[in-house]
Amino acid sequence: MTTKTLTEEPSRKRFKTNKSEIIFKEAYLEESTTTSSSSSSDQPPRQIKFTQKHQSILLITHLKDPLKVQTEYPIPDLQPHEILVHNRAIGLNPIDWKGKKYGFGIYHFPWINGRESSGDIVKLGEQVDTSSYAVGHKVIISSTSYRDNRTSTFQQYTAIDSRLVWKLPESFSYEDGATIGVGLVTAGVILYNSFGFELAEKPEQINGTILIWGGATVVGLYLSQLAKIYGLKVIAIASTKHEEYLRKLGVDYLIDRHLSEDEIIEKIDEIEEVESIEYGVDCVSKETSKTVLRILDHKLKKEEKEKDEEEDVKNTQVKPKFSGIVGIPKEYPETVDVRDVVIKRFHEDVSYGRKFIEITNKFLNTRQVEPVRFKQYKGGLHIIDDALKDLEKIGANGEKYVVSV
């Protein structure tokens, strides 16, 4: 874990920069007269009333204008199933800088970016299950409802569906929690929705292999861990400087991404334990998606050739499945079954999203899935712009960029 600090670590009240003084107001929590007076540490936090009306946000006023911290911005109102979360650590994603730079994913001005965070519940909607969630609970959130700025995380307080949040494991820091949302949801959608894996705490084991191009991306890191839970062998295409870390997370075979396409295929063919590749995922680009598709096509045809000549052998071969996070080429081999990555299912299909949260929260609690390592920026909303510039320039290099608020 590496850290970049704007100044000395700020108090939660205020800090100074060379540009301005940013004030972060603490939530004012007033005890309700109707609640229990129990002070046992084993009891859930008491019901308390949240009275704060305004917050600070990081605002996009125009695509060409710099990001702006604005104070006295209204705190989101809650829908019946929603909770209000005081963000304590915020995870950054490439779309947070790409959307502004290239003009996509921003539907109106002013606009608030940010897709994931971890923090404390400060307010409950009318229909929140109070047997599961209470004010003061620490949670992890992932906002896949991109058009709703209330769910964005580049602000002090985020409104989010209570049925779609993880509880932060006791052994995790807020920064650990901020690495999880988007990466784990995306990895899960690929396995459970695109590839049709069983969504279960103790799933049936799968005898097969998955190839992940971009094994050191955050999605790749979580995908490798989930794949191992299902018994898959994992081939990762990534920089060899991450080899020790990737093997720790479950990667069986690492192939240097700097090799040529033909050299990578040759390296894969040299793996004696892998006769076939049933699943392929690209986490990087449309161009690398083409390469993964070529590898899957090559491996299937090679397997067919090596088999004894049997009647209708080609018709009985199961097509390998492929999903590309960034994009899928318009043309691809007929030998590959190409599947879309439907991220929005997480929030649109609440029954699926809720079950996904339930199962993966158990994986996190038992450390079957570990939070990925992170690069920490201290300085709250005001340092997000610097962190995004680093993310654009350097890229996510086997770690998550996280801002502590």
What are these regions (language model features)?
Residues 4-36, 40-79, 86-124, 129-405:
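Terminal helix/beta-alpha structural elements that buttress the NAD(P)+-binding lobe
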